[in-house]
Amino acid sequence: ILLCAKHMEAAVTQSPRSKVAVTGGKVTLSCHQTNNHDYMYWYRQDTGHGLRLIHYSYVADSTEKGDIPDGYKASRPSQENFSLILELASLSQTAVYFCASSGTGGALDTQYFGPGTRLLVL
């Protein structure tokens, strides 16, 4: 019950939940958190694979590259909002994208995940 209550308090939302984009088009995925967390993350998940970190941020107005940043930009205009931008979407960027937030960014710190955004690039 404690985990459920904690989860309900730690809201991370994403928009859109699904999107179809054309190759070469610009795509912006938005994430909003009400946790007052310093750290925010964008991951991608491909079929049959685990999560891979694209970009993260530990403070507003600053972003850092993750493990697979190529082809992506990120923007953290405020504590609550963290966007992932594909300037020129490509077929290889078809995936499910997850945003998460955490308090300290430590290895043992819980990350709270959004519901995911399914992106299909045609």
UniProtKB/Swiss-Prot annotation:
What residue spans carry the region label J segment?
109-122
Please report the name of this protein according to its UniProt entry. Answer: T-cell receptor beta chain V region C5
Signal sequence extent: 1-7
Miscellaneous note, as given in the UniProt record, is: This sequence was derived from a T-helper clone.
Mind listing the GO biological process terms from this record? adaptive immune response; cell surface receptor signaling pathway
**Source organism of this protein record:** Mus musculus (Mouse)
Q: Which UniProt keywords apply?
A: Adaptive immunity, Disulfide bond, Immunity, Immunoglobulin domain, Receptor, Signal, T cell receptor
Q: Does the keyword Transmembrane helix apply?
A: no
Cystines in this chain: 31-99
Instruction: Give the residue ranges for region: V segment.
Output: 8-103
